[in-house]
Amino acid sequence: MRLGKRIVLILNKIDLVPRSNALAWLQYLRHEFPTLPFKASTQQQRHNLSQGTSMTWKSRTGSDAEWAGGAESVGTREILQLIKNYSRNLNLKSSITVGTIGAPNVGKSSLINSLKRSRVCSVASTPGHTKVMQGIMLDRHVRLLDSPGIVFSDANAPPGATAEEIAAAAEAAML
């Protein structure tokens, strides 16, 4: 990226697609950027949201499988480890800022809630719930930014745009 920012793709709502589709998208997207699968917590309590232990799949048929669901988040530990590795490798005395960028209703606020293990960002099932950007301190080294959904115009992300072109448009929107 032109500003030296690192991009990591989070394939959210992984529990809503068949295993074969998720694995194919993970393989494809990892050619461009580090990509991690994720499922946000759907627990109702406000604090101490639990995290699943690993990315496991439950066989449904002989040819395909579906996500072994539950209310806990899955993929959180891997994302936290990646963020902490980036933070440690930069060897900074201050915190790093991790922004969430995506279309409306893709789970940016839910991702932050799952990482923080607390309901720090308001969420709703309707698109456009997050109106302004807000910063959340994950710990003393990492600050998370929750952002409103970005809707790309045809000029910014034409059909068939590469991941690099979409990332550049998203970066421009965050400036």
Regions found by a protein language model. Name each.
Residues 2-8, 14-97:
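Canonical P-loop GTPase G-domain recognition
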Residues 3-6, 126-175:
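Helix-rich effector regions associated with P-loop NTPase G domains
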Residues 21-23, 40-41, 48-51, 112-117, ...:
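Short coil/turn segments at secondary-structure boundaries
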